[in-house]
Each structure stands twice: as C-alpha cells, then as structure tokens.
C-alpha cells in the first residue's frame, strides 16, 4: 500500500511454475523461504500453473501474501486486477498488452502501487505520464524465464533510457550474479529476478549480493 515505502532493490518474482519438479505445496515452501531471505518486494506471478480450481489459486496467493506480510515484504500481484483487489495487495504489475494504468486506477483506486513493464523508448516516453508508480524495464539480457519476452535491450541502451526516465525503476531479464556489478552503476532502483534466486544455492547470500550492488 502507498502508506508504506516501496523499496525496489531486491524484487523477487515467482509462482509455482518456477519450481516445475515440485508439487504446488512444496513450491510454496521454496518461495516462502526466498521471501524471508531479505527480498524487498515479492511479485506473485503464476502464469502456467495448473490449479484444481479458482479457489486453490486464491489460497496459494493468500499463503504467500501472509508470508510476505510477516516478513515486511511488499506483495505485488502480476496482471490480475480481480485478485489484487480480493487480496488487498500492496500493488499490481501490468504489461503493455494489459489495460491502461488509468483504467486500472479506476478499478483499484489510489492506494495500491501500479508497476508497468517497458521494453523500448516509445513505451518509456508514454509511461512517464501514465500514472504508474514504478517501471520494470527489460529484458536487459536474454532470458528463459519468460517465453514471450521481447528482444534484449542491453545495458548501454538501458543506461540511455534511464537518462530520460523520472520514475523509480527495476531492471529485469536475464540478470545473473555476474551482471550485478555493471547494473550497479547505471541508476536503477532495483533488479527484478526469477531464476537468479529460484536457482540459487544460498538465497540469503544472493539477496545480500543484490543489495550490496543496488543501493
């Protein structure tokens, strides 16, 4: 909610589909451990997850929201306005193909944060006046975490985009431990990651490395 400070530094995105070899319950346990490892934002993104019914999805989201709340981690819902409203989430994140930010504002009011994905200069320019609270720019590097990802923009182009940007921003897409250093020097408010954490052998150490580089 907007009465809290939105700390974007270590922005974790995941759903049960990001642990394909695990049951939904075991995936929730893994995600919960990562949420409690020091991340600052958790985005519930469950595209590709097969649930028994709508109620099971709601229960999964509620369980993860409760973990985030207890850990003082901001809880963001990906795309789904209805779910964000039902949970009274801290915010919602949408893409260019979803409803406009102004339309979403009509549905959720002013209390939730709205994040918007941006992948090129034209979208960035439009986003400045969209009413979004923060942006996710990328993909920066090639990524396997999203099958519908746009072409990578690269660090140099991202740096130029940030020169024309007035909104808090996370970089996203293909971020590895080795790329954190170069991303620390271009003015990002945070990095949004999936596999960097889901595939990590030590979640707390990886989150600490993110925070050491993105300040």
Curated annotation (Swiss-Prot):
Which residues are involved in binding Mg(2+)?
Answer: 79, 98
Keywords from UniProt, A to Z, are: Magnesium, Metal-binding, Thiamine biosynthesis, Transferase
Q: Quote the record's binding site residues for 4-amino-2-methyl-5-(diphosphooxymethyl)pyrimidine.
A: 43-47, 78, 117, 146
- Key word Magnesium present: yes
- GO MF annotation, one: thiamine-phosphate diphosphorylase activity
Name the Gene3D superfamilies for this protein.
Aldolase class I
Q: What is its EC number?
A: 2.5.1.3
Reactions catalysed, as given in the entry: 2-[(2R,5Z)-2-carboxy-4-methylthiazol-5(2H)-ylidene]ethyl phosphate + 4-amino-2-methyl-5-(diphosphooxymethyl)pyrimidine + 2 H(+) = thiamine phosphate + CO2 + diphosphate; 2-(2-carboxy-4-methylthiazol-5-yl)ethyl phosphate + 4-amino-2-methyl-5-(diphosphooxymethyl)pyrimidine + 2 H(+) = thiamine phosphate + CO2 + diphosphate; 4-methyl-5-(2-phosphooxyethyl)-thiazole + 4-amino-2-methyl-5-(diphosphooxymethyl)pyrimidine + H(+) = thiamine phosphate + diphosphate
Q: Which GO terms describe its biological process?
A: thiamine biosynthetic process; thiamine diphosphate biosynthetic process
Binding-site list for 2-[(2R,5Z)-2-carboxy-4-methylthiazol-5(2H)-ylidene]ethyl phosphate: 143-145, 174, 194-195
Instruction: Output the Gene Ontology cellular-component terms.
Output: cytoplasm
Q: What cofactors does this protein use?
A: Mg(2+)
Q: Which superkingdom heads the taxonomic lineage of this protein's source?
A: Bacteria
Q: What class of enzyme is it?
A: transferase
Q: How is the cofactor bound?
A: Binds 1 Mg(2+) ion per subunit.
- Biochemical pathway: Cofactor biosynthesis; thiamine diphosphate biosynthesis; thiamine phosphate from 4-amino-2-methyl-5-diphosphomethylpyrimidine and 4-methyl-5-(2-phosphoethyl)-thiazole: step 1/1
Per the entry, what this protein does is: Condenses 4-methyl-5-(beta-hydroxyethyl)thiazole monophosphate (THZ-P) and 2-methyl-4-amino-5-hydroxymethyl pyrimidine pyrophosphate (HMP-PP) to form thiamine monophosphate (TMP).
In terms of HAMAP family, this protein maps to: TMP_synthase
Q: Which family does it belong to?
A: Belongs to the thiamine-phosphate synthase family.
Name of protein: Thiamine-phosphate synthase
- Give the species this sequence originates from: Lactococcus lactis subsp. lactis (strain IL1403) (Streptococcus lactis)
Q: Coding gene?
A: thiE
């Amino acid at each position: 909610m907007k009465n809290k400070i939105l700390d974007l530094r270590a922005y974790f995105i995941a759903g049960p589909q990001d642990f394909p070899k695990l049951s939904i319950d075991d995936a929730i346990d893994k995600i919960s451990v990562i949420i409690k490892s020091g991340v600052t934002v958790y985005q519930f993104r469950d595209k590709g997850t097969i649930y028994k019914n709508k109620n099971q999805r709601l229960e999964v989201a509620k369980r993860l929201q409760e973990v985030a709340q207890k850990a003082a981690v901001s809880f963001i819902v990906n795309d789904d306005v209805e779910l964000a409203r039902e949970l009274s989430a801290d915010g919602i994140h949408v893409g260019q193909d979803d409803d406009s930010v102004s339309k979403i504002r009509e549905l959720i009011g002013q209390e939730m944060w709205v994040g918007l994905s941006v992948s090129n200069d034209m979208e960035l320019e439009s986003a400045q006046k969209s009413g979004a609270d923060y942006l996710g720019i990328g993909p920066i590097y090639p990524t396997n975490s999203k099958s519908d990802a746009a072409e990578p923009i690269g660090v140099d182009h991202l740096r130029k985009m940030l020169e024309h940007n007035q909104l808090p921003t996370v970089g996203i897409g293909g971020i590895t431990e080795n790329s954190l250093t170069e991303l620390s020097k271009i003015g990002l408010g945070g990095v949004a990651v999936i596999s960097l954490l889901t595939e990590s052998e030590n979640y707390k150490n990886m989150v600490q490395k993110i925070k050491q580089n993105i300040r």
